[in-house]
Amino acid sequence: MKKLILFFIPFICIGQLKFLPKSKGEYVEHTYYSLSYIEDHEQAEWVHYKLNSEMLNGKKVRKRYYIIDKKVSTGSANYFDYTNSGYDRGHLVPAADMKMDSISVIEASYMSNISPQNRNFNGQEWRKLEEHVRFLAKKNEIYVTTGGVLSYGLDSIGTKNKVSVPNLFYKIIYNVKMEKMTAYLMPNKKLESFKNYKVTVDLIEKLTGIDFYHQLEDEMEERLESML
Protein backbone atom coordinates (compact mmCIF):
# COMPACT_ATOMS: atom_id res chain seq x y z
CA MET A 1 0.00 0.00 0.00
CA LYS A 2 2.81 2.43 0.83
CA LYS A 3 4.43 1.77 -2.54
CA LEU A 4 1.17 2.56 -4.33
CA ILE A 5 0.82 5.92 -2.57
CA LEU A 6 4.40 6.91 -3.32
CA PHE A 7 3.83 6.17 -6.99
CA PHE A 8 0.46 7.93 -7.27
CA ILE A 9 1.31 11.31 -5.72
CA PRO A 10 4.30 12.13 -7.97
CA PHE A 11 2.15 11.17 -10.97
CA ILE A 12 -0.33 13.91 -10.07
CA CYS A 13 2.38 16.50 -9.44
CA ILE A 14 4.06 15.92 -12.80
CA GLY A 15 0.82 16.90 -14.56
CA GLN A 16 0.63 20.08 -12.54
CA LEU A 17 4.03 21.27 -13.73
CA LYS A 18 2.91 21.84 -17.35
CA PHE A 19 2.54 25.45 -18.51
CA LEU A 20 3.52 27.12 -15.24
CA PRO A 21 3.78 30.93 -15.50
CA LYS A 22 7.08 32.62 -14.78
CA SER A 23 7.13 33.43 -11.09
CA LYS A 24 8.02 36.74 -9.46
CA GLY A 25 7.24 35.40 -6.00
CA GLU A 26 7.94 32.25 -4.01
CA TYR A 27 7.01 29.16 -5.99
CA VAL A 28 4.92 26.69 -3.97
CA GLU A 29 3.84 23.30 -5.32
CA HIS A 30 0.92 21.39 -3.85
CA THR A 31 -0.48 18.08 -5.04
CA TYR A 32 -3.29 19.51 -7.16
CA TYR A 33 -2.15 23.05 -7.92
CA SER A 34 0.87 25.34 -7.83
CA LEU A 35 1.16 29.01 -6.92
CA SER A 36 3.49 31.99 -6.71
CA TYR A 37 3.24 33.76 -3.36
CA ILE A 38 4.00 37.48 -3.04
CA GLU A 39 4.89 38.29 0.56
CA ASP A 40 4.39 42.05 0.11
CA HIS A 41 0.74 41.40 -0.74
CA GLU A 42 0.22 38.29 1.46
CA GLN A 43 -1.38 36.30 -1.35
CA ALA A 44 -0.63 34.47 -4.56
CA GLU A 45 -0.01 36.41 -7.76
CA TRP A 46 -1.21 33.30 -9.58
CA VAL A 47 -2.49 29.79 -8.95
CA HIS A 48 -2.31 27.21 -11.73
CA TYR A 49 -3.95 23.81 -12.06
CA LYS A 50 -5.31 21.19 -14.41
CA LEU A 51 -9.01 20.29 -14.50
CA ASN A 52 -10.94 17.57 -16.32
CA SER A 53 -14.19 15.60 -16.10
CA GLU A 54 -12.68 12.79 -14.05
CA MET A 55 -11.45 15.23 -11.40
CA LEU A 56 -14.89 16.86 -11.23
CA ASN A 57 -16.51 13.50 -10.45
CA GLY A 58 -15.05 13.57 -6.94
CA LYS A 59 -17.48 13.34 -4.04
CA LYS A 60 -15.50 14.98 -1.26
CA VAL A 61 -17.35 17.90 0.33
CA ARG A 62 -15.72 21.23 1.15
CA LYS A 63 -14.77 21.73 4.79
CA ARG A 64 -15.44 25.29 5.96
CA TYR A 65 -12.10 25.98 7.56
CA TYR A 66 -8.95 27.79 6.51
CA ILE A 67 -5.38 26.66 7.06
CA ILE A 68 -2.09 28.58 7.13
CA ASP A 69 0.07 27.32 4.28
CA LYS A 70 3.27 26.11 5.92
CA LYS A 71 4.94 25.65 2.54
CA VAL A 72 5.14 29.44 2.24
CA SER A 73 8.52 30.14 3.83
CA THR A 74 7.55 33.61 5.09
CA GLY A 75 4.19 32.40 6.36
CA SER A 76 0.89 32.93 4.60
CA ALA A 77 -1.93 35.22 5.70
CA ASN A 78 -4.25 33.78 8.34
CA TYR A 79 -8.00 33.50 8.92
CA PHE A 80 -8.16 36.47 11.29
CA ASP A 81 -6.60 38.87 8.76
CA TYR A 82 -10.00 38.83 7.03
CA THR A 83 -12.23 39.01 10.11
CA ASN A 84 -14.56 42.06 10.10
CA SER A 85 -12.84 43.36 6.96
CA GLY A 86 -16.00 43.45 4.88
CA TYR A 87 -14.40 41.13 2.31
CA ASP A 88 -14.96 37.46 1.56
CA ARG A 89 -12.17 34.93 1.83
CA GLY A 90 -12.25 34.32 -1.91
CA HIS A 91 -10.79 31.10 -3.28
CA LEU A 92 -8.49 31.40 -6.29
CA VAL A 93 -8.70 27.64 -6.89
CA PRO A 94 -12.42 27.07 -6.18
CA ALA A 95 -13.28 24.52 -3.53
CA ALA A 96 -15.78 23.04 -6.00
CA ASP A 97 -12.85 22.16 -8.31
CA MET A 98 -11.08 20.29 -5.51
CA LYS A 99 -13.38 17.41 -4.54
CA MET A 100 -11.13 14.56 -5.67
CA ASP A 101 -9.99 13.38 -2.24
CA SER A 102 -9.21 14.61 1.27
CA ILE A 103 -5.88 16.06 0.11
CA SER A 104 -7.54 18.27 -2.50
CA VAL A 105 -10.14 19.49 0.03
CA ILE A 106 -7.40 20.49 2.47
CA GLU A 107 -5.30 22.18 -0.21
CA ALA A 108 -8.26 24.29 -1.35
CA SER A 109 -8.48 25.59 2.22
CA TYR A 110 -4.93 26.96 2.40
CA MET A 111 -4.81 30.71 3.06
CA SER A 112 -2.29 31.02 0.22
CA ASN A 113 -5.25 30.19 -2.05
CA ILE A 114 -7.34 33.04 -0.64
CA SER A 115 -7.69 36.68 -1.72
CA PRO A 116 -10.02 39.47 -0.47
CA GLN A 117 -13.09 39.63 -2.68
CA ASN A 118 -16.14 41.85 -2.61
CA ARG A 119 -19.08 39.72 -1.45
CA ASN A 120 -21.27 40.68 -4.40
CA PHE A 121 -18.42 39.87 -6.78
CA ASN A 122 -17.42 36.56 -5.19
CA GLY A 123 -20.95 35.24 -4.81
CA GLN A 124 -22.29 36.33 -8.18
CA GLU A 125 -20.45 36.82 -11.47
CA TRP A 126 -17.11 35.39 -10.26
CA ARG A 127 -18.96 32.29 -9.07
CA LYS A 128 -20.71 32.04 -12.45
CA LEU A 129 -17.34 32.22 -14.20
CA GLU A 130 -16.08 29.40 -11.98
CA GLU A 131 -19.14 27.34 -12.94
CA HIS A 132 -18.44 28.08 -16.61
CA VAL A 133 -14.88 26.79 -16.16
CA ARG A 134 -16.22 23.51 -14.77
CA PHE A 135 -18.61 23.25 -17.71
CA LEU A 136 -15.66 23.57 -20.10
CA ALA A 137 -13.59 21.03 -18.14
CA LYS A 138 -16.32 18.41 -18.48
CA LYS A 139 -15.88 18.57 -22.26
CA ASN A 140 -12.09 18.76 -22.52
CA GLU A 141 -9.16 18.86 -20.12
CA ILE A 142 -8.13 22.44 -19.44
CA TYR A 143 -5.48 24.41 -17.56
CA VAL A 144 -6.62 27.29 -15.39
CA THR A 145 -4.57 30.22 -14.08
CA THR A 146 -6.12 32.71 -11.67
CA GLY A 147 -5.04 35.66 -9.54
CA GLY A 148 -5.55 39.24 -8.50
CA VAL A 149 -3.72 42.06 -10.25
CA LEU A 150 -1.21 43.06 -7.58
CA SER A 151 0.49 46.45 -7.47
CA TYR A 152 1.70 48.96 -4.90
CA GLY A 153 -0.84 51.40 -3.51
CA LEU A 154 -3.70 48.93 -3.11
CA ASP A 155 -5.93 49.09 -0.05
CA SER A 156 -5.19 46.41 2.53
CA ILE A 157 -6.88 44.50 5.34
CA GLY A 158 -5.55 42.70 8.39
CA THR A 159 -3.64 43.68 11.50
CA LYS A 160 -0.94 41.02 11.87
CA ASN A 161 -0.51 40.71 8.09
CA LYS A 162 -1.30 43.41 5.56
CA VAL A 163 -3.30 41.69 2.83
CA SER A 164 -3.69 43.72 -0.36
CA VAL A 165 -7.18 44.04 -1.83
CA PRO A 166 -6.95 43.64 -5.63
CA ASN A 167 -9.07 45.96 -7.75
CA LEU A 168 -9.05 43.40 -10.57
CA PHE A 169 -9.05 39.60 -10.81
CA TYR A 170 -8.14 37.54 -13.87
CA LYS A 171 -8.73 33.99 -15.03
CA ILE A 172 -7.05 32.31 -18.01
CA ILE A 173 -8.37 29.05 -19.46
CA TYR A 174 -6.31 26.97 -21.89
CA ASN A 175 -7.92 24.13 -23.83
CA VAL A 176 -4.96 22.20 -25.21
CA LYS A 177 -6.97 19.89 -27.46
CA MET A 178 -8.92 22.72 -29.09
CA GLU A 179 -5.89 25.06 -29.13
CA LYS A 180 -8.00 27.77 -27.56
CA MET A 181 -7.15 30.29 -24.85
CA THR A 182 -9.80 32.41 -23.12
CA ALA A 183 -9.18 35.11 -20.52
CA TYR A 184 -11.31 37.27 -18.25
CA LEU A 185 -10.39 40.42 -16.33
CA MET A 186 -13.02 41.50 -13.81
CA PRO A 187 -13.29 44.41 -11.34
CA ASN A 188 -13.63 43.36 -7.70
CA LYS A 189 -17.20 44.64 -7.29
CA LYS A 190 -20.80 43.84 -8.21
CA LEU A 191 -20.94 43.31 -11.97
CA GLU A 192 -23.10 42.55 -14.96
CA SER A 193 -22.48 39.28 -16.81
CA PHE A 194 -18.93 37.88 -16.61
CA LYS A 195 -19.15 37.41 -20.38
CA ASN A 196 -18.69 41.16 -20.78
CA TYR A 197 -15.17 40.96 -19.31
CA LYS A 198 -13.42 38.75 -21.84
CA VAL A 199 -9.95 40.07 -22.73
CA THR A 200 -6.72 38.86 -24.32
CA VAL A 201 -4.00 37.15 -22.33
CA ASP A 202 -1.68 39.80 -23.74
CA LEU A 203 -3.56 42.47 -21.77
CA ILE A 204 -3.32 40.48 -18.52
CA GLU A 205 0.42 40.02 -19.08
CA LYS A 206 0.79 43.76 -19.57
CA LEU A 207 -1.07 44.55 -16.33
CA THR A 208 0.60 41.89 -14.17
CA GLY A 209 4.08 41.62 -15.66
CA ILE A 210 3.66 37.83 -15.65
CA ASP A 211 4.67 35.73 -18.66
CA PHE A 212 2.00 33.05 -19.18
CA TYR A 213 2.43 29.98 -21.41
CA HIS A 214 5.99 30.89 -22.31
CA GLN A 215 6.65 27.17 -22.93
CA LEU A 216 4.65 27.29 -26.16
CA GLU A 217 6.34 27.93 -29.48
CA ASP A 218 6.47 31.66 -30.18
CA GLU A 219 4.03 31.57 -33.09
CA MET A 220 1.45 29.59 -31.13
CA GLU A 221 1.89 31.69 -27.99
CA GLU A 222 1.38 34.91 -29.93
CA ARG A 223 -1.70 33.54 -31.69
CA LEU A 224 -3.38 32.12 -28.58
CA GLU A 225 -2.58 35.03 -26.29
CA SER A 226 -4.06 37.54 -28.74
CA MET A 227 -7.38 35.64 -28.92
CA LEU A 228 -10.50 37.45 -27.76
Question: Model features per residue range: what roles?
Answer:
Residues M1-K18:
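Bacterial Sec-dependent N-terminal signal peptides
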Residues K24, V28-E29, D218-E222:
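Functionally engaged cysteine thiol sites
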Residues Y27-D88:
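Short, His- and charge-rich active-site/binding loops that engage polyanionic ligands
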Residues F11-I12, M55, A95:
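Generic N-terminal helix/loop capping motif
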Residues K71-L228:
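Domain-level detector of nuclease and nuclease-like folds
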Residues I14, K24, N57, T146-G147, ...:
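Feature targets compositionally biased, intrinsically disordered low-complexity regions
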Residues S23-K24, Y32-Y37, L168-Y174:
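Short, surface-exposed beta-strand/loop micro-motifs that present aromatic residues
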Residues G15-K22, Y66:
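Viral RNA-dependent RNA polymerase
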